[in-house]
C-alpha cells in the first residue's frame, strides 16, 4: 500500500466539503460522483473520535474520577487511531462518492450527501462503527455520538458495499455497510428501538463540553 495519507486525506476532504456545500461534488479523475438508488452506504473509520479527544482535554478530571487508567488508555488509543488509506483508494471507481464526517457527526454527513443529490437514504444507527469507550464517555457527558465530530472517518457510497467494507477491513480500518441509497427523498433511520426520519443537522455535541 502507499504510505498513510490520513492527515492529507482529512485536509483534502475537509476542503472539498467546504467547497461544495449542498451541491453535487465535482472531483477528479472521474468527474461528478454518483449517488443512485440501490447503492450501499459504507462507513470507514469509527465515529466520535475528535469529540472523545476534546472530552479528554476539557474534562480530564471528570474522566479520571469516573474511569480507571486502563480504560482511559484504551479510549486514547481508539480516539487517536488514524484512518490509514492510500490516496488511490479514493480514485477507485468502486467508490462513487464520499463525505468526510466532521462537524455535526455522521448524521450531518448523511444529511449533506443525500441532500446534495436530492436522493433518499435508509440506514441503521446500530450498524455504524463506534467504540465502547467512546459510547461510555458520551453517556457520562450526555452526548449523542452520532452528532459528535469524528475526524478520521468517511462516509462512502458504492455499488458493492460489502466488498468495499471487506477491503477496508483488510487495510486495518473499521468498516461497515450501514444502509442504502433509496428512491424518493426520505431519509429513513432505524435503530435504538425505533424507526423514524433523519432530522436537519444539529449543533455539534462537542459544544456541550464547554
Stretches found by the model and what they are:
Residues 171-210:
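Acidic, Ser/Thr/Pro-rich beta/coil linker or hinge segments at domain junctions
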Residues 157-163:
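Helix N-cap motif at beta-to-alpha junctions
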Residues 1-53, 180:
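Glycine-rich anion-binding loops of enzyme active sites
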Residues 75-149:
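Active-site-proximal betaalpha loop/short-helix elements
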Residues 53-75:
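Short, compositionally biased
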Residues 4, 32-36, 89-92, 115, ...:
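Solvent-exposed alpha-helices and their adjacent loops that cap or buttress functional pockets
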Residues 57-62, 111-118, 139-141, 166-174:
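Short, solvent-exposed amphipathic alpha-helical segments in soluble enzyme
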Amino acid at each position: 500500500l502507499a504510505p498513510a495519507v490520513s492527515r492529507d486525506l482529512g485536509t483534502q476532504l475537509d476542503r472539498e466539503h467546504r467547497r461544495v456545500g449542498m451541491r453535487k461534488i465535482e472531483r477528479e479523475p472521474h468527474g461528478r460522483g454518483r449517488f443512485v438508488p440501490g447503492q450501499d452506504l459504507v462507513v470507514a473509520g469509527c465515529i466520535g473520535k475528535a469529540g472523545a479527544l476534546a472530552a479528554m482535554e476539557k474534562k480530564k478530571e471528570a474522566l479520571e474520577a469516573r474511569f480507571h487508567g486502563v480504560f482511559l488508555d484504551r479510549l486514547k488509543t481508539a480516539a487517536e487511531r488514524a484512518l490509514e488509506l492510500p490516496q488511490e483508494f479514493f480514485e477507485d471507481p468502486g467508490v462513487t462518492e464520499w463525505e468526510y464526517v466532521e462537524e455535526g457527526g455522521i448524521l450531518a454527513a448523511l444529511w449533506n450527501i443525500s441532500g446534495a443529490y436530492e436522493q433518499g437514504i435508509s440506514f441503521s444507527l446500530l450498524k455504524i462503527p463506534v467504540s465502547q469507550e467512546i459510547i461510555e464517555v458520551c453517556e457520562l457527558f450526555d452526548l449523542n455520538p452520532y452528532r459528535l465530530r469524528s475526524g478520521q472517518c468517511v462516509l462512502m457510497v458504492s455499488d458493492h458495499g460489502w466488498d468495499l467494507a471487506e477491503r477496508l477491513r483488510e487495510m486495518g480500518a473499521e468498516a461497515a455497510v450501514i444502509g442504502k441509497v433509496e428512491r424518493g427523498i426520505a431519509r429513513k433511520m432505524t435503530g435504538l428501538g425505533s424507526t423514524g426520519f433523519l432530522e436537519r443537522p444539529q449543533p455539534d455535541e462537542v459544544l456541550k463540553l464547554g
